[in-house]
Amino acid sequence: MKQFFLLVCLCLWACIATAQSQDTPLNGKKIENEKPPIALYKFISHQRDTTYLDTTLTIQKSYKFNYLRSDTFELLPFSNVGQTYNGLAINTTSKRLTPLFAAQSHHYNYKEIEDVSYFNVPTPLTEIYFKTAFEQGQQLNAFFTINTSKQFNFSLSYQGVRSLGNYQQSLTSTGNLLITSNYFSKNNRYNVRFHVASHDILNRENGGLTQNSLALFINDDPEFSDRGRLDVNFEDAENNLKGVRFYMSQEYSLLQKADSTSTTALTLGNSIWYEEKLFEYRQNTAYEPYGASYEPVDLYNKTTLEDFNIQAYARLENTLLGNFKVFTTLTDYNYGYNSVLNLDNGQIPNRIKDNMVSVGGAYQKQYKGFDLAAQAAINVSGATTGNYINAAAGYSLNEDTRVQGSIKIHNVAPNFNFQLYQSDYVNYNWKTEFNTIKTQELGFDLWSKKVANLSLSYTGIDDYTYFAINPSQSQEDTFLRPTPQQFTSRVNYLKIKAEREFNWRGFALNNTIMYQNVLSGSTVFNVPELITRQSLYYQDQIFKNALFFQTGVNLKYFTKYNSNGYDPVLAEFYVQNEQEIGGFPVIDLFFNAKIRQTRIFVTWEHFNALFSKTNQYFSAPGYP
């Protein structure tokens, strides 16, 4: 607490000192209403791509005004803000050499290293995001950044969410803290970046509605219009995902491009990061449908991961040859539990450990109008198998049209909780020996102002892993639970997405349509065939152009499909082919406004629910 108080005091002192130096120029005369150009407010991504502060109001900003601060077109949210999302589409990762941690359904709001940005601003910059939540709750994101000098920037952001929810035992609580800093030497030869990220994502779990409550909900019984009166399967469970990460990256330019005639630059760098993750599941009393338990009361599962990485790299930039990067990474991870589990038919270990070395490279070049890029990496030592190759070529046909083709090949071990899991529930304990997941993807993208933005991908997956109800369980076994499984055949998956906006005077119609087809493996790979979103709105300026507004209606629809089910013990989704969801539109009414740099969003969500005679909208089986 003392350190945090000192940090806040230093920030306030820096704000005051910077404000004084900016308000009073060297000649002693105060300059009124002088504002730096917006292009001086720079946002720098992990990949060192630079964007600028954007205070405009667009329909895309409305799509991103949510808990994740991103467009959720391919996601289906649960009933309460801060809960998980069911995926309407599958996006395969392509640059990962190690397995992922447990509880992936709760990682949507977990900032990984690639999600962290750094900043460079001429004056202190603050952004406050506030949005109401369900039943005694609020969402708040607070962001502050300042340059104490031209070379050093510091930023602090915090996301806090607490929402009781409309259904019993669905409270959510999120507290995510991110601190970043970056420094450039005056000659721009040396640069260092640092961040600390802390996550605390709590969800109380209820197991979904009981069968009787599901019938009352579907029939829209007026006595249960207050959703809090519907019974849930249990009222005494919660899970919690926590994580903390320390990251530092620095580089030094041995050779610099001094001017436009220089042809070569050489940079050496290294990165080091350490991360701890913790997933906990608590339940006061064992829930019978999950099967027998080692403890009848006060059930508690704790899964941990310690992940340490050191990377060294060299980057060569040459006007003629292109940009090259080579790197090597040392990784040491330790996943698991505190004790070994001894069973009648064997033993379940408590740890998965490895110390591995990977090497890789990247290349980028502009050649005769083509933008060429490639990345590759492979684990060369250690027990963990993993590699990837990504390549892309883009070409601008004209100022309005650009095309790109890509290929991705990725092999990686299944997530840790597919390999090893321990729980106080007897049925939730396993140690598996699965094959490496092998993914190949061909992609094509078109960006055209006159036609549409189009993306097409064809993905093939061998040894696809998933959670599902074991089909070998007897019909007399009422304790059906998801277990890790690996598909012995190949999954082939086609996805086509198109976006286009039509404008006429002050009216606009924004369209997003996605078509999906699982050509093989549809029994284990559940996605809707069609997803569509249309936004019809009107925009204009009023009050002598002091206020810019947009008002209209959003419609989102996806076809019926066998949605994945949700398991609160694992905090994972599992494949089920018994119950379909979807086939219903969700219509929102909205009014957005911008006054100077303030943006206001007012939305009446799911407006058409007022006119439904029955309720068929679910986020997952058992979860309205």
Task: Write out the residue ranges for each language-model feature.
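Exposed, low-structure sequence patches enriched in small/polar residues
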Residues: 3-4, 21, 121-123, 240-283, ...
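Long, disordered, Ser/Thr/Pro-rich
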Residues: 156, 292-294
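Acidic, small-polar-rich N-terminal luminal/periplasmic segments of exported/outer-membrane proteins
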Residues: 25-122
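Cleavable N-terminal export/targeting peptides
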Residues: 1-57, 203-214, 610-616, 620
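Outer-membrane beta-barrel proteins
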Residues: 39-43, 49-50, 55, 131, ...
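Flexible loop and strand-edge segments within Gram-negative outer membrane beta-barrel domains
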Residues: 188-249, 277-287, 295-299, 303, ...
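Short strand-turn segments of transmembrane beta-barrel domains in outer membranes
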Residues: 99-101, 112-118, 122-144, 165
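Transmembrane beta-barrel wall of Gram-negative outer-membrane proteins
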Residues: 138-160, 169-202, 250
